[in-house]
Swiss-Prot record:
GO terms for biological process: DNA recombination; regulation of DNA recombination. May be involved in recombination. NCBIfam families: PRK00321.1-1 (NF001460), PRK00321.1-3 (NF001462), PRK00321.1-5 (NF001464). This is Recombination-associated protein RdgC. It is found in: Cytoplasm, Nucleoid. It holds the Pfam family RdgC. Belongs to the RdgC family. GO terms for molecular function: double-stranded DNA binding. The gene is rdgC. Keywords: Cytoplasm, DNA recombination. InterPro entries: RdgC (IPR007476).
Length: 303
């Protein structure tokens, strides 16, 4: 279903036109098509509502959700190595000589081309939420690389996409460290029982605390010894729990049952109406959380 699990947050660095009607046509030019026999990977747009709609965008209250699909061919290294060694051995026996490195490299390409049509495919989907009201773009993934790949596809589709990772005026890890040291987070937030602390020294250690009182003397001693908090589990207004990371990303989002059940009165058979209602609910909550978080972390860095 729609509920995002992670958030990589980006700021639009200047205003651009993001009208859904126009975007629908632009995304259609980069719609997903499966890998051909010689493609290692393909990426493109699919309807965020899956088989329930052909639209590549879903819009509500100035919020747009889109979905990218990626197909990757799986060719394990041992399979390539085995096929290549067999081909090299066969040719060396036929020609009664050792093959040069350039010849072996050329053979590797041949082997890849011969194996590709028979390779299995791995599919993945990444949802992206565009907040045109606040000038933010959120990608539902846990890695910056995956987020950047999805943003690159959108940039190619639109022709231009001036975005930068959302960054704070003060280093996030120092703010998180102060929250743990004082035992109190910013207004609206509550410390949970999980954190990661890292030494500022290059060869320093990493401490991962789970199901632990973060106000305990043990954690305080690590901070006094020079470690900083790089990940911190937080609760926001008893509505959403998440792990705040020092790169500005939010991981392992967990919406409270009361929130998720808010649209239970909608007939489950009416997928489109439920999708729309959940999208409005989720984006409204997350937009408020992000704004609250920016304020709590000391404000955004000047652009």
């Amino acid at each position: 279903m729609l509920w995002f699990k992670n958030l990589m947050v980006y700021r639009l660095s200047r205003e651009i036109s993001l009208r859904a009607e126009e975007m629908e046509k632009q995304l259609a030019s980069m719609a997903f098509t499966p890998c051909g026999s010689q493609d290692m990977a393909k990426m493109g747009w699919v309807p965020p509502m899956g088989s329930h709609s052909d639209a590549l965008t879903h819009v509500a209250n100035g919020q747009i959700v889109i979905c990218a699909r990626k197909e990757e061919k799986i060719l394990p290294s041992p399979v390539i190595k085995q096929a290549l060694e067999a081909k090299i051995a066969k040719l060396e026996a036929e020609q009664a000589r050792k093959l040069k490195k350039t010849e072996k490299d050329s053979l590797k390409d041949e082997v890849l081309h011969s194996l590709l049509p028979r390779a299995f495919s791995r599919f993945s989907q990444t949802m992206m939420w565009i907040d045109t009201v606040n000038g933010l773009i959120m990608v539902d993934c846990a890695s910056a690389k995956k987020a950047e790949d999805t943003l690159a596809l959108l940039r190619k589709s639109l022709g231009s996409l001036p975005v930068v990772p959302l960054s704070m005026a003060n280093p996030i890890e120092l703010t998180l460290t102060e929250w743990v040291r004082s035992g109190s987070a910013a207004q609206g937030f509550q410390l949970l029982d999980e954190a990661e602390l890292k030494s500022l020294l290059e060869d320093g250690g990493v401490i991962r605390a789970k199901k632990q009182d973060l106000t305990s003397e043990e954690i305080t001693n690590h901070i006094e010894a020079g470690k900083v908090v790089t990940k911190l589990a937080l609760d926001w207004q008893q509505r959403i729990q998440f792990v705040m990371c020092d790169d500005g990303s939010l991981k392992r989002l967990k919406f409270c049952d009361e929130l998720r059940d808010q649209n239970e009165d909608i007939d489950r058979e009416d997928f489109a109406q439920r999708f729309d209602a959940d999208f409005i609910l989720m984006t409204g909550e997350l937009a408020a959380l992000i704004q609250n978080l920016i304020e709590g972390l000391g404000g955004e860095a000047q652009r």
